[in-house]
Amino acid sequence: MEFIPAQTYYNRRYQPRPWTQRPTIQVIRPKPRRRRPAGQLAQLISAVSRLALRTVPQKPRRTRKIKKQKQVKQEQQSTTNQKKKAPKQKQTQKKKRPGRRERMCMKIENDCIFEVRHEGKVTGYACLVGDKVMKPAHVKGTIDNADLAKLAFKRSSKYDLECAQIPVHMKSDASKFTHEKPEGYYNWHHGAVQYSGGRFTIPTGAGKPGDSGRPIFDNKGRVVAIVLGGANEGTRTALSVVTWNKDIVTKITPEGSVEWSLALPVMCLLANTTFPCSQPPCAPCCYEKKPEETLRMLEDNVMQPGYYQLLDSALACSQRRQKRNARENFNVYKVTRPYLAHCPDCGEGHSCHSPIALERIRSEATDGTLKIQVSLQIGIKTDDSHDWTKLRYMDSHTPVDADRSGLFVRTSAPCTITGTMGHFILARCPKGETLTVGFVDSRRISHTCMHPFRHEPPLIGREKFHSRPQHGKELPCSTYVHTTAATAEEIEVHMPPDTPDYTLMTQQAGNVKITVDGQTVRYKCKCDGSNEGLITADKVINNCKVDQCHTAVTNHKKWQYNSPLTPRNSEQGDRKGKIHIPFPLVNTTCRVPKARNPTVTYGKNRVTLLLHPDHPTLLSYRAMGRIPDYHEEWITNKKEISITVPAEGLEVTWGNNDPYKYWPQLSTNGTAHGHPHEIILYYYELYPTTTIAVLAAASIVITSLVGLSLGMCICARRRCITPYELTPGATIPFLLGVLCCARTAKAASYYEAATYLWNEQQPLFWLQLLIPLSAAIVVCNCLKLLPCCCKTLTFLAVMSIGARTVTAYEHATVIPNTVGVPCKTLVSRPGYSPMVLEMELQSVTLEPALSLDYITCEYKTITPSPYVKCCGTAECKAKNLPDYNCKVFTGVYPFMWGGAYCFCDAENTQLSEAHVEKSESCKTEFASAYRAHTASVSAKLRVFYQGNNITVSAYANGDHAVTVEDAKFVIGPLSSAWSPFDNKIVVYKGEVYNMDYPPFGAGRPGQFGDIQSRTPDSKDVYANTQLILQRPAAGAIHVPYSQAPSGFKYWLKEKGASLQHTAPFGCQIATNPVRAVNCAVGNIPVSIDIPDAAFTRVTDAPSITDMSCEVASCTHSSDFGGAAVIKYTASKKGKCAVHSVTNAVTIREPNVDVKGTAQLQIAFSTALASAEFKVQICSTLVHCSATCHPPKDHIVNYPSPHTTLGVQDISTTAMSWVQKITGGVGLVVAIAALILIIVLCVSFSRH
């Protein structure tokens, strides 16, 4: 059905033109006349009578005008009524005459959609699309078709959809679907649907609950989406739909979407009769008319899911229509009342029954706000009306009003009250050891209640500040929302016990008079037999005394908080109600300050930070290698800290600032191309240990060789002069004496010979001194002429660009697992021009498989009001509650009166109960305990292939293939199966901790896991908090107990630094899902499948000749700090791949354009001080030689584009000096050896 979308005006934005009265002709009907006799005679008689009785016309009387005005007014009133009825008529008209789009959809829907019914009501729709029957999963009920109702549906919670195969005989009724969704207008049951920006929207009011499952059609009648719900956004409503994208099902869910299945009425119970909770048809359904019966009905349905609907209906039963405002939130308090409860310290060091008793102090909010529950009620007056400026408290058994301005809270100093409603106060307080709440009553008397409570505002972030900054950083935190609307949090209430009041009794002679003062009074007297009852009028008891009677006021028209500080109503037992409470705890963001940036000074492999904290600020740092060596320190004053920067890098976090990262460079003060002392200084600053070891070894070797030479010379000398010394009167020849430094004529000392030469022959004296100098000159000249006896030794092990040459269609290479470092590989095939592939890791994610064991959080201890059994013994009953404890205590209260208000002669007992539940904060403040299993690794890789930069994502498992243009890449698996996560991890608010937590069901008191639950919302709770009930003190109603502190709170204080700060290899830890990002560990193999069409034949590529390379400048260990100029001659214009055949050199350019005779400049990076490398352009190689100098910057904030795995190489200059020294020492040894050999040969020949 093709049609052109027409402009329609249903659901238009503009209101219809206002109705105006049109000018009409007033028709006045004549009065009814009497019937006249027929015939001409009768007509003649009437005509004569008219002529005879004719009078002069007169002006109309005023009465006629008044009647006319009245008539006009009546017409105006009828017109006004028509105006009021006009919109209703128009709406009914609109429903009767649907627009073109609606008529179009109705025709298609007649065949392809079916109603889903539940208990006779339509809750949604099912649609026949393609070969499937589709129904929203949230729609409850059965399809209104016998064949479709029998089908077995498959449920998908991800898409909120249920699907089944269409019966064969119904396939012709199904609609087609399409994934083509150009922006524009589409059709559905209620008119037009606009599709723009990937969202479907309709005018607000066009859709409603019950429309879930309706299809959206295009102009050809094809289904483009199925409606699930909607989100009201003002004038427009965004639809939540299931749609298709290239045959893939997707779900579009705008924020705030509500499911549009028809809500089913929730049923409540009264006297074995069910009724809708929102519409109670019973007699006691209005609290204002029958309060006691209404509360009884609510207590009977307290566990029903529609309890709060019933409560709202019972409170809003008045026929008067009320506006919805903040007063409605206080409406529930009309069924409750304040109360008196026991306070341990009423301000004067003694306990009392206080009207402002403290029930509970909550401090879960991480922004430091306290939520305090007290026994009085704020914002409600005694007449149950709402007034922000008032509060009501219990004075004896009567509520009394007071001004809210007299309310105060303090710890070590006055607190700031930020919100109040009902029993609850929000306050921001300074740290302290106690908390006091008080107010001034209507008689100007101050009432206070003090509790021991250690309050220390929690730390948000990494700086201990005192006030919110104007500018800073937003961090996640939790706070109590300042809203009085109904929330998910609730408290239990019950009927209050009878309140004793002995002032109602007066002694009159021998009788007791009970004055009720309009109240219901329960009395019991022990005189002349048992005399007890319930009265509402004054009563006189004869022959009795006041001491023999007990009176108590009974009020069952209002509930009271189920407090452990007040007794339970013995008649009601466990009956109770519940009401919502304000100020829920929610997650939000808090602005925190950012510390001043430190003054950074770079040194050789060190960074010095000058810190200026405005308040105590945390400084932490870690190495980004295998051993993180994490340190942290609180800085309170100006301080200078020097930190060593390892080769793998350093991460420093200062306050709430983002982490600073530093990497060292191979900088030094010496040079590898200077004199020996400069060379030694160069290598000493780079590798001090290695340099010292090499110098020590060389010194030992040289000293040994020199010593050996001297030893051989001494041996030769001894061999030469010994025969002459043994012959009497022998004279040593002159030449031998000169060579062996021996006396020729007589055995004189060197001093005597020198004296003799100085006195007799001074020329010979000077010649004797010149002999060693000439020998040194000869040795130096020999060293100069000594040819190079050894080649340059390099000790560099650099892995930067793995250039592997292959001759196959398939190519494999290995790239380092370092993000941001480009890696190249050269692919060579016979007959084809070489191809260069450049790959760069942009991110590597390691995601473990997790299984949730449980969540743990703070617990709260529930202590219901104690049950006091007067004149008898109570019994405990078993209850399936977490950490439930129940004990019965005897001999607690006196037989007469006492704190339990008993009036009997037998023993009284108290039944105390307590159990543990998850705190209200568990929905936002909890830690999740996971088991971590095998991790999957995924990589985001940038590939330069065929002149295009393409980014792909793939699993690094060695199996998952991704396509880049026409090539297939298989990445992984990693060379190192390493993970920063242990087998057990804990996740708390975006932070991950390795922790060996206790298993489910084995928690220990006061430690992590003392309370456990499967999810934050689940009802199954395990607890072990060492809860022990204790004997109550006589004279006061209370439930004392002993309990271990919260293990969750203790863990929060002692948990230490998270993996975000302590993980090795520079891992960045993230959550949702839990993963480790960019861990620089190991290597990643890459297998590439390249088709033949991607290669260029040699005949088609340019031929390069006459190539020469000249390095203009070179700074080693820097980011492409070298520049080389290559001159060439190309046979034709084209594009050639550029690659360094030497692994130790990285070239930035993957390919260049060549033409004719020209030159090109390339940038390269190397860690060599003397770089000898070959550059391949197309198929031609050229040799380049570079003399590189160290970088000037000691520290940089980016990783090096190459990775060194050993010591630096030895420069050509250094090798030249090594050759000279080695040659010189070797020459001396050789000469000495030659002399010794000659001497030995001559000596042996003589003998």
Curated annotation (Swiss-Prot):
Stretches the record annotates as E1 fusion peptide loop: 892-909
Gene Ontology molecular function: RNA binding; serine-type endopeptidase activity; structural molecule activity
Region (Dimerization of the capsid protein): 182-192, 218-222
Active site: 138, 160, 212
Residues bearing carbohydrate: 272, 587, 669, 949, 1078
Short motif Nuclear export signal, span: 143-153
Disulfide pattern: 112-127, 268-277, 282-286, 285-317, 343-449, 346-352, 415-429, 477-590, 525-549, 527-544, 720-741, 857-922, 870-902, 871-904, 876-886, 1067-1079, 1109-1184, 1114-1188, 1136-1178
Upper classification of the organism: Viruses, Riboviria, Orthornavirae, Kitrinoviricota, Alsuviricetes
InterPro entries named among the record's database cross-references: Alpha_E1_glycop, Alpha_E2_glycop, Alpha_E3_glycop, Alphavir_E2_A, Alphavir_E2_B, Alphavir_E2_C, Flavivir/Alphavir_Ig-like_sf, Glycoprot_cen/dimer_sf
Reaction catalysis annotation: Autocatalytic release of the core protein from the N-terminus of the togavirus structural polyprotein by hydrolysis of a -Trp-|-Ser- bond
Region (Functions as an uncleaved signal peptide for the precursor of protein E3/E2): 261-273
Positions marked as site (Involved in dimerization of the capsid protein): 186, 219
Name of this protein: Structural polyprotein
Positions of transmembrane segments: 692-712, 720-740, 763-783, 1224-1244
Source taxon at top rank: Viruses
Domain Peptidase S3: residue ranges: 112-260
Amino acid composition bias (Basic residues), ranges on this chain: 59-71, 82-100
UniProt motif (Nuclear localization signal) ranges: 60-98
Region of interest (Ribosome-binding), ranges: 98-112
Keyword Iron applies: no
